[in-house]
Amino acid sequence: MKSPCRAAAGWLVLLLSSCCLGYVIATEWAAAVTTDNGILFFDSNWRKISSAAHQYSRISAFAYDEVLGKLYFADLDHPEYRLFALDYDDTDELHKVTKLLPKSAQTAYISGMAFDHLERRLYWTEKGTRSVYYVAIDELLSSTRSAAAAANGTAAAAATAVEATTSAPPPSSSSPVQLVATVQPDHELAGLAIDECRRHLYWTNCYPKTSNIVRAAMNGTVLNVHEEQVYLPKGITVDHYRNRLYWVEKKYGRRYTIESADLEVNDQRTLQTGLDRLPADIAVKNDYIYWTDQENNEIYEMSKEPNAPSRTVYRGEHPSAVILRANLLLEHQRNNPDCRSVVDRILENMQNSKPASVLQQETQQQGQLTVCLNNGTVNHHTNTCLCQPAFGGKLCEIDLCNNYCAQGSCRIGRDNRPRCDCDRRYEGDRCDRNRCDGFCLNGGRCQFSNGTAGRTEEEMGDRTCLCESTGYSGARCENPICGTDYCYNGECYVEEGKRPKCRCKAGYRGERCEEYSCNNYCLNGGHCTLGNETTVPECECGEEFAGQRCEIAVRLCSTYNEDPQWQQYCLGISKTLPLMEPKVTYCKESFNRTVVYTSLCFTVSFALLLAVVLVVSRMMKPPRPRITKKMVVTPMTSRPPTTQCEITIENCCNMNVCETPCFDTKLLKKSKKEDKQFLLEDIEDVGGSYRKLPNCGDGTAERK
């Protein structure tokens, strides 16, 4: 059993260790961005805290190893090597860069990169060979360290630059690079991502005519290809929080989009679209998306919801790729059912692969190793703690739910973040806001209806507002009972029962003071005026009428002054008034418009009827017969030439009725068909009608 003094000393050492680590915690990087001037590191508020790898000016892709805390990146301008590893140290300005793989056909043009923590493999896409490759990173790092130690003779070689650099050995005949898959010639590989929980690879093809998103097994077997509504996709990432994919596209012309789909590359959604942007890479963290824009040299942050606004978190040196250090797999996915088994295997492998320095420390200095509280796991590669769900801090000493929810119960979500189930009277991320605060407007009083203590997301209608004596109504006392235009000529007030009432100005009346007091007040032509003091309407009546509103005819009071029914109306009116007959005036220039209009309509109708009859009779009247042929009477064979008679009918219209044989009054009684038949028969008959004709010329010629 430990003594109290030793136990107290142990806790003191632990407390001092936590205090000493405070500066480290404050300066830990949360995001890394590749630029034309190396790699930049930022804190959680996107403030620049450090930079590294300044001599590498064309970094095309990089990936993060959560177990070793290393950054692997590819530089396309280095004359000899393509793949590098960066050891970032928060407390040291000298960030060690290790050269891993030399330039070759397999590493010439690396465009995308991803790291698999379970199998400890680094994957990348290479444009020149149109292939996906991987390398076992632990074996590569081990061979690199061995070769460097053999070449230098000692590990304490002095650094000659800002970053210390360790070179890898010359490439051997057996390359550690392994081929995963090769795409078709009309494909151009771009981004690469890994779903470590479900063991899938995703890569993008940005060739214009065959653009697509490919999902494949870890051995390169293609599972499905998504081509619909995909054009020039670039960076791609896996969101383990929501089990979705996110990628960026450069659309036709000036357009760009941020796209999303499920892990089977279905259910595609466009989260954002716009103009004049050149997106290159994308990363996710919690509820936000971050993507780089090489057109304006900016990094944007936006929510994962569609059409969410974006804000600029960085503007500077041509950012190309971005990584968010969220310890997503090891810390935040232990509550994810799809990732729990993978995370447990990763942690087991991590414990079984302790560095030699740690093994030596365990042998020589037992009891002085780093201790993680609350069943946390020590990562001996980085000398940090991987905490159990519900705990955090450098040594897992912080209970994430301790005093987190002000009015409610705390639970740990699948992203290893605390969540609050609020009591029915409170809301907010930490249940720190009363739901009645500011709910009722204009002085209304808020109260909760009876219900259970628990409250679901849909149960929002359990609070009501009491708007008594406020002059307002509505669910939140937002509607004024007395609107600005309720009383037209007066003042509005609320009476008991929440009903609006009007106090009218002098000279107005009505429920809403809408009527002038003198309007239609005086009858029978009386003149209305308002009293100067009482503002009560008064009537000035003519000679024939009397009464308060000129409603009593004076002549009736003179006639029925003894009638009790009339006495109440005629009281006060003189009984000696003469019997007056009502005056009737006539307008001298008046006329009966009805008679005039009726006569006018009758005249017009008769004229129209007459015109119609004339037109119809004219159309029904048969036309006169007309002869259009030239008639010649040929000489008779039995007659001598001197006795022949010849008549030529040229124009019957030039003859009068008595002279021409073309006109016969009897023909008018016949129809056109009979008239034509008679005419033809008469022409064919030589004797015909001409036997009835008188002698031609001077009468000397006679017909025989």
Swiss-Prot record:
PROSITE patterns (alphabetical): EGF_1, EGF_2, EGF_3
Membrane topology, as annotated: Single-pass type I membrane protein
One annotated GO biological process: spermatogenesis
InterPro entries tied to this protein: 6-blade_b-propeller_TolB-like, Cueball_EGF_LRP_Nidogen, EGF-like_dom, LDLR_classB_rpt
Assigned keywords, A-Z: Cell membrane, Differentiation, Disulfide bond, EGF-like domain, Glycoprotein, Membrane, Oogenesis, Repeat, Signal, Spermatogenesis, Transmembrane, Transmembrane helix
Gene Ontology cellular component terms for the protein in this record: plasma membrane
Positions on the Extracellular side per record topology: 27-594
Cytoplasmic side stretches: 616-704
Placement of LDL-receptor class B repeats on the sequence: 69-119, 120-166, 199-242, 243-288
Signal peptide limits: 1-26
Membrane in keyword set: yes
Stretches that traverse the bilayer: 595-615
Subcellular location per the Swiss-Prot or TrEMBL entry: Cell membrane
Residues carrying a glycan: 152, 219, 375, 450, 532, 592
Family: Belongs to the cueball family.
Function text: Has a role in spermatogenesis and oogenesis.
Protein name: Protein cueball
Species annotation: Anopheles gambiae (African malaria mosquito)
